[in-house]
Every structure is written in C-alpha cells, then in structure tokens.
C-alpha cells in the first residue's frame, strides 16, 4: 500500500535517503510516516555506529557512485534519550539555563545532539520543546542504556523530563543469552 504513495506521475526521483517511521503492532509493522530526510531522533543512534566518512557518502550519492563506497557499521548498540522542556509537547518555557555540560555543550562519554538549545554569553539555554538527544553506544544494549541515562543524570534544567523506558521492549525481546554478549573489535 505504501507503493501507491511513493510511485506515480507526480513522484520525483531524488538522490537522497528514504526514512520510514514504523510502529510494531500485534498485526505486524505499520508505516506511520516516510520522508526523504533523516528522522529525528532516529538518526542520532545511526550516525555514531557508522564507520567511515558521512561526507564521502553524500558526495558519492551526489556523483551517482555510491556503489564504489565501502560503508561499514560498528558492532554493538546505540541509544538516545531525548530530554524535553517542561510542558512539552503542549506549552513549554524557553530561556531556562542548562547545567552539567562542558563549554562545547557535551558530556564526557556521550554524544549530545542539540535541538532546542541556545548558546549565549558562554551559557546554554533551552530554546524549544525537544532540547537534547543524549546518545551513547556500547557493546551491549544494557551498557548503552546505562551510559545514556548516566549522561542524562548530569544535565540539569528546570522542568526537564525524559522517558525512562527507552530500550525496555528491546531488552525483553533479545534472547537471554545475548544480553551479556560482547562483540570483538577487529
């Protein structure tokens, strides 16, 4: 059924990515959206696992030579916890000072993706509903989750909130013997 929306006389072929937002249901996966762009926050867990140069990949797409580029992926898992402003998604305050990040807006051991932030006079402030994507990778899913939530615990701002159930369904779905599985790096 998706094909009818993707193919037709008005379909414009582009050299880009195709992003699908999926939801698992008792009747199988369902598409809730698709776009010719990266998804947010989904991309935050993909990019840290990429081995190689993203700019080289984009250049190869532009030059129609993507088949010539070796694209590899790191072993392990990556998780992202979105920190949101109080009141999000309805009504939220902007301009709340944020604490716990270094002067580059990072936390040791994590990738901090700024979404609704503003940097002014050497300080970070909230400037939107979804404020940060706190992303960590590790050899195990539990390890990645632990690192993400540890980094979240270091970042403070009035009204902050975040989901505490990220990755829990995946942990339950993994075979029991895979929870402590560690991958060897080549």
Model regions: which residues?
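Conserved metal-phosphate-binding beta-hairpin within the catalytic cores
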Residues: 10-40
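Glycine-rich phosphate/pyrophosphate-binding beta-alpha loops
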Residues: 32-46, 87-89, 118-120
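Short, flexible active-site loop motifs that bind/organize anionic cofactors or intermediates
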Residues: 1-2, 45, 133-134
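Single conserved hydrophobic/aromatic residue that forms the stacking wall/gate
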Residues: 1-8, 12-13
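Peripheral (often C-terminal) accessory segments that flank ATP-dependent C-N-forming ligase machineries
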Residues: 60-186
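Short, structured loop/turn "capping" segments at alpha-beta junctions
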Residues: 16, 56-57, 89-90
